[in-house]
């Protein structure tokens, strides 16, 4: 099984996405709409389709879910927004990483891998490298700071090549 360990902020959205959704939530008189850029979801979908990968959420947004009977249940509007965005593109979240008290993402990925021995290959898509130093060869690094950043077309080939190694 191929796995994509997926962060959300800085991968499926950017600072520009947050600004747009902030204003949209004001227009709809809603507290907050969680911004996920539809184009970036299409890039993710392409990676998933071409590698048959499963998505494991590493984002701090995974705390907006609980796992019950092997299903992810959203705990709030943010969780529902994430699930709805994924569903619109026929994407699903396979699992979430466990919580490390030190909040080190690399430790959380390690714990997940230790508990799931049916993994053939994996990549990590994240906008940060902190805590992921041991996984540099598996990392697809994105950037949150600009509208053209986040997951983009340049990352698709890199991700596919790493997963097909």
For every predicted segment, state its role.
Residues 2-100:
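Alpha-helical substrate-recognition element adjacent to the catalytic core
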Residues 74-165:
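C-terminal cap/substrate-recognition subdomain and adjoining C-terminal extension
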